[in-house]
Amino acid sequence: MDSLTAAASVIAAALAVGLAAIGPGIGQGNAAGSAAEGIARQPEAEGKIRGTLLLSLAFMEALTIYGLVVALVLLFANPFA
């Protein structure tokens, strides 16, 4: 692998992880804030809100893990090499 391809792969891997973490990070913050607000308004619905929040947080975190997988493929099993 030449040095230009290696450098581009490292930069692409960094962008994959960084950009894949921005969206879910913002979404998780908004979801947690809305859940806290909902629990404050209706404490009796805390169980349902918490369950829905945890499920949605898991789906959002999956997007970040996909970005990590793409970065690892670019670094260790580079299809462009």
Curated annotation (Swiss-Prot):
One of its GO terms (molecular function) is lipid binding. It is found in: Cellular thylakoid membrane. The keyword Transmembrane applies. GO terms for cellular component: plasma membrane-derived thylakoid membrane; proton-transporting ATP synthase complex; proton-transporting two-sector ATPase complex, proton-transporting domain. The chain crosses the membrane at residues 6-26, 57-77. This is ATP synthase subunit c. Its main location: membrane. It is a multi-pass membrane protein. Keywords: ATP synthesis, CF(0), Hydrogen ion transport, Ion transport, Lipid-binding, Membrane, Thylakoid, Transmembrane, Transmembrane helix, Transport. F(1)F(0) ATP synthase produces ATP from ADP in the presence of a proton or sodium gradient. F-type ATPases consist of two structural domains, F(1) containing the extramembraneous catalytic core and F(0) containing the membrane proton channel, linked together by a central stalk and a peripheral stalk. During catalysis, ATP synthesis in the catalytic domain of F(1) is coupled via a rotary mechanism of the central stalk subunits to proton translocation. InterPro entries: ATP_synth_csu_bac/chlpt, ATP_synth_F0_csu, ATP_synth_F0_csu_DDCD_BS, ATP_synth_F0_csu_sf, ATPase_proteolipid_c-like_dom, F/V-ATP_Csub_sf. The record marks 61 as: Reversibly protonated during proton transport. It comes from the Bacteria.
